[in-house]
Every structure is written in C-alpha cells, then in structure tokens.
Regions:
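General small-molecule cofactor/ligand-binding pocket signal
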Residues: 77, 162-165
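N-terminal FAD cofactor-binding segment of flavoenzymes
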Residues: 83-124
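A conserved short coil-to-beta-strand element within the FAD-binding core of flavoproteins
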Residues: 165-180
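Short beta-strand to alpha-helix junction loop
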Residues: 92, 133-155, 164
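Glycine-rich FAD pyrophosphate-binding loop
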Residues: 55, 59, 64-90
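Extreme N-terminal leader/targeting segments of oxidoreductases
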Residues: 1-53
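Short beta-strand segments that buttress and anchor functional surface loops
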Residues: 181-185
Length: 186
C-alpha cells in the first residue's frame, strides 16, 4: 500500500470525495475554465420587512461571530452547506486568541479548558535549509474543534439563532433597506 493509500484509508469516509471535488475546482480555476457566477444583484427598490439582522454563510468559522451577535440581541441565521460540526483534527491557536471567547462571554472557563486538547512549548519554526527558530506561546494550544463548535452551536441555538444545515447560498439581492438571500437545500 502506498503512503497516499495508507493516509487516505485513515480519513473519514466523506473526506476523499471532498478533497477530489476541491482539487477539480482549483485545477479548473487555474486553467481559467472556472466560470465565476454573479451571485449578488442590486436594486434601488425597498425590501420592506426583515427576518434577520445578519445572515452568515458558512458555519465552521461563522458560528463564532453568529453566536456573539445572537447573544447580544441580534437576530442571526447561519447558512451551512453541510452539517455544522468540527473536524477530528486539532486547531492550533494561542492563549491570547482563546481568551477572546471568555471576553465575549461565549465560553466559560470550564468550557474553554475542556476545549483545549494539547498545550506545548516551545515550538520550532523552520524552513528547509534555514536556521530553526524556537518560539513560545505562539500557536501552542491545540483545540478540539468537534467540542468547541458543538458548544457554540448549542449556545447559538439556545439564544434563538437559526441554523440552516444542508442549505447552500444561491444568490443575494441588495435592496435599498436590506438584503434578500436565496438558498437551496443540498
């Protein structure tokens, strides 16, 4: 078994097909065969009533801002093409960045500590043929994204946020007083 086959066999079932789709997209894009769809229209007409103060496309990173806004009284919806969940690979971050979750009252101390999977110091930064640089407290904390996103997702929903999973963004129309968003089930 080749190294590629070995690594691929250890991936969750959906990952190889997702990687193949992304690779095909970027190959087509590099060859200038990728048509860029116009997805935002504008009009001077008025929309009238609004259902949300903010609509966020993409939940994996969008959940952070969505949860913060929703918990501050905004009416927020998230449009997520798949299911909003973290991947099985840790995210690296610094303590200073993590503290933003506490400052924004998105996580409790206990939740933050539970989200931390690994802490290490120092870290080596280097490039082939160059001199290694050892740094402390820079991207030295591994966070469990499965846990982190699930906690934020529940807090968002508990605060009244709307999560549209398996829903893709199609287009937006910018009116004089708001934006209408069209979606499609995936």
């Amino acid at each position: 078994m080749s190294l590629f086959e070995s690594v691929r066999s250890q991936m969750p079932a959906e990952i190889p097909s997702q990687l193949e789709r992304m690779d095909a997209f970027w190959t087509s894009y590099r060859q200038s065969n990728q048509e860029i769809a116009k997805v935002v229209q504008t009009t001077s007409e008025k929309l009238g009533g609004k259902d949300f103060d903010a609509i966020i496309c993409g939940g994996t990173l969008g959940i952070f801002i969505a949860c913060a806004l929703q918990r501050r009284g905004w009416r927020v919806a998230i449009i997520e093409k798949g299911i909003l969940r973290g991947r099985a690979q840790e995210w690296n971050i610094s303590r200073k960045e993590l503290n933003a979750f506490l400052e924004l009252d998105l996580l409790t101390e206990a939740e933050l500590e539970t989200a931390i999977a690994t802490i290490y110091n120092p870290a080596r930064v280097g490039f082939q043929g160059g001199k290694d640089l050892w740094v402390r407290d820079i991207l030295n904390i591994g966070v469990d994204p499965v846990y982190l996103l699930e906690v934020l997702k529940q807090k968002f929903l508990d605060a009244g946020g709307i999560l549209l999973e398996k829903t893709a963004f199609k287009q937006a129309i910018a009116y004089a007083d708001g934006v209408a968003v069209e979606v499609a089930l995936t």
